[in-house]
Curated annotation (Swiss-Prot):
Domain of life assignment: Bacteria
Species this chain originates from: Shewanella sp. (strain MR-7)
HAMAP family: UPF0246 (MF_00652)
Family the UniProt entry places it in: Belongs to the UPF0246 family.
InterPro entries xref list: YaaA (IPR005583)
Protein name, per record: UPF0246 protein Shewmr7_3045
């Protein structure tokens, strides 16, 4: 079972990681191509392109300028410990045991605009480059065209290594658009999380992001290996709804918080 998640805009490079064990991203040469494009952007260009404040644009211009591919554990951090956001709050990587961390490294993949597809222990430098950014580059007009089939092929390779052809998509639509579902060599399962509000069950972004992280952690903790086992997910008050589920979209409900 391979789990796909999105990265986070919120980063933590202050707190030391739980382990010195690390790996290197597979697509650093591609990352360097993108960095070279980004290094030509002014802070004003970045503010317009990414729709961010001048302060954030200036910070990211500096990050692009300082980025070098030969970074190490001394000035970088493993992705699973660097990303902080709702998904990662739900996943709570800081409480993983060494055995759970090993399973996470094997089963979890993080889609990234800059790095393509990350393993949890892959070292990253601070950056902001969302997958939906319309960054013109040598391969096209945006990052979806830049990555092309590369990430789909990488997911298929990871699935083949697992020997289990279940792919659990817990990524956002923005990031999963970088994958070509029809070319995936496995069964794609996309869980849906709905909370009760104003008289109906609906997807509430903040809660859904946390739930995706909690489900990813549940899969690791419980060593889930089948869809039936996935349906037993019951963290934080969620429960499986057969009535609202579709064959490849199991739906989980939660009452008003």
């Amino acid at each position: 079972m391979l789990i796909l998640v999105s990265p986070a805009k919120t980063l933590d490079f202050e707190q030391p990681p739980l382990t010195q064990i690390h790996s290197r991203p597979d697509f650093l040469t591609h990352s360097q191509e993108l960095i070279q494009v980004c290094q030509r952007l002014t802070p004003s260009d970045i503010a317009t392109l990414m729709k961010v404040s001048d302060n954030i644009a200036g910070l990211n211009a500096a990050r692009f300028g300082e980025w070098k591919p030969d970074y190490s554990i001394d000035n970088a951090k493993q992705a699973i410990f660097a990303f902080r956001g709702d998904v990662y709050t739900g996943f709570d990587a800081d409480t993983l045991t060494p055995e759970q961390l090993e399973r996470t490294q094997s089963q979890l993949r993080i889609l990234s605009g800059l790095y393509g597809l990350l393993r949890p222990l892959d070292l990253i430098l601070p950056y902001r480059l969302e997958m939906g950014t319309a960054l013109a580059n040598p391969k096209g007009k945006n990052l979806y065209e830049f990555w092309g089939n590369i990430l789909t092929d990488a997911v298929n390779n990871a699935v083949a290594e697992q020997g289990d052809y279940l792919i659990i998509n817990l990524a956002s639509n923005e990031y999963f658009k970088a994958i070509k579902p029809k070319k995936l060599a496995g069964q794609l399962i996309t869980p849906v999380f709905k909370d009760f509000k104003n008289g109906q069950y609906k997807v509430i972004s903040f809660f859904a992001k946390r739930a995706r992280g909690m489900m990813a952690r549940y899969i690791i903790d419980q060593q889930v290996s089948s869809i039936d086992e996935l349906k037993a997910f019951d963290v934080a008050g969620y429960y499986y709804s057969e009535e609202l589920s579709k064959p490849n979209e199991p739906t989980f409900l939660r009452e008003a918080q």
